[in-house]
A protein has these predicted regions:
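Short, flexible hinge/linker loops that cap or flank conserved catalytic cores
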Residues: 1-2, 90
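Accessory recognition modules or surfaces
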Residues: 2-8, 41-46, 51
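N-terminal Rossmann-like FAD-binding beta1-loop-alpha1 element of flavoenzymes
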Residues: 5-32
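Residues that form or flank phosphate/diphosphate-binding pockets in enzymes
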Residues: 18, 41, 106
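Glycine-rich FAD pyrophosphate-binding loop
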Residues: 24-46
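Dinucleotide-binding Rossmann-like beta1-alpha1 core, especially the glycine-rich loop
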Residues: 49-133
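Short, intrinsically disordered, charge-balanced linker/junction segments flanking boundaries
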Residues: 138-142
């Protein structure tokens, strides 16, 4: 069998499958090359987090790409729901970085500073404030 394709996508996870879908919608003939079944490797093991702000301790150019990816995710979730009826339960929640000593607190404040300079919402909560929202967190959190 000798098929001809416009594009070959290596990997049939969430990203590869999404790219293949949108290319096919635009009229491209697409092949997905996957060693197992669709979404059986990294996509299967992923926690489902879009932790753009949790990935880097210092500014990294990949941060901008990750932010763009996060920005289009609500649209992708809506398209998936519309076309398949699958609701992935997308929610925008945020993430905590926890400090248990002054060095960790300073590191978090540094991260918060550069993230705010990029326009991200990032702010410091005291241990008491965090425990109001998450009461089972340790008293050692400052």
């Amino acid at each position: 069998m000798c098929e001809k394709y416009d594009v070959a996508i290596i990997g049939g996870g969430v990203i590869g499958s999404s790219v293949a879908h949108f290319l096919a919608e635009r009229g491209h003939k697409v092949a997905i090359v996957e060693k197992q079944s669709i979404a059986s490797e990294a996509s299967k093991a992923a926690a489902g987090l879009l932790g753009v702000q949790a990935e880097w301790d210092a500014y990294n150019p990949l941060f901008e790409l990750a932010r763009e990816s996060r920005a289009i995710f609500p649209q992708l979730a809506a398209v998936l729901r519309e076309k398949t009826g699958i609701d992935i339960g997308y929610e925008e929640k945020g993430i905590y970085r926890i400090a248990q000593n002054e060095d960790e607190k300073e590191r978090i404040l540094h991260i918060m500073d550069w993230q705010q300079k990029t326009g991200e919402d990032s702010y410091f909560l005291t241990g008491d404030h965090v425990r109001e929202k998450e009461p089972y967190l340790s008293e050692s959190i400052i």
